[in-house]
Amino acid sequence: TVVIISSVTGNTKEVVDAIKKIKAEVGSTVISFVDAKEAILLDLGDYKISYPVNEQLKFFMVADRFMFNNGELEDYEDMYAEFDKYLAEALVEVEKKAEPFAVEFAKKHWNDEMHYFVGAGNQWGATYSYAMCYWEEQLWLKTKSITSNEFFHGMFEIVTKETPVTIYIGEDAQRPLSERVANFIPRICENYTIIDSKDYELKGISEKYRKHLSHHVMHAVNNRIDVHMEIETRHPMEIRRYYRRLEY
């Protein structure tokens, strides 16, 4: 059994307790990604990488390697040869291209009473965490995240002309689910945004590998949105009301 953890501080009590229990009772191999250079979770890890930010990239690089070792990712070596050579610069260029859009998005949505985020496939985890961990936790803005396939199972009945809705569209097998939402939403709403990874060039990356990177493109776009949301809200994303301030 392998357990992969990611932590900024490396000392979150609940995670520390969980890893101690896992190592004592199961004997799992632990891979620790921790932003801090020294931390308890680094000490508990069998394999450890101390490097800040880019959690998604770290996780997917490890997951891809596991799949390759298990014979489930035939193009791994060719794909990662391209990623190693081109991906870093390509994602920087995504952020540059997204900048004007991010400015306008933040100006439009910084004071939303409620914002809905929709995504599917390898975009879904990022959609869920962006709504909860960024807008709710870090910006104190109310959100709801929903999968594209569930959009038509209730949620669309509360969408009106003014409802803020952002739809993320990736390039994997579940793209049609998000396209369906994007094609429908203009009929009922005038306050929607579509963020499609296909709109962003990834220079040097083969078309067949883009599906593996949709969520990284989304993260790059969101990085720029976050910068301008901080400016518009006058709210630094580092501050918290309750986390590490109150016992719970």
Region annotations inferred by a language model:
Residues T1-L87, Y168-T193:
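Glycine-rich phosphate-binding loops that contact phosphosugars or nucleotide phosphates
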Residues V2, V62-F66, V159-K161, I205-S214:
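Short, surface-exposed amphipathic charged segments that create phosphate/polyanion-binding patches used
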Residues V2-S7, M114-G121, P164-Y168:
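Short glycine-rich or small-residue beta-strand-to-loop segments that form or flank ligand, phosphate
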Residues D35-K37, S148, S197-Y200:
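Short, ordered loop/turn segments at secondary-structure junctions
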Residues L44-D46, D112-E113, K161-T163, C189:
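Short, well-ordered alpha-helix to beta-strand connector turns
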Residues G45, V181-Y248:
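Phosphate-moiety recognition in structured ligand-binding domains
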Residues K48-Y51, E55, M67-T147, F152, ...:
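Active-site phosphate/pyrophosphate-binding segments
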Residues G125-T193:
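Internal helical hairpin/lid segments
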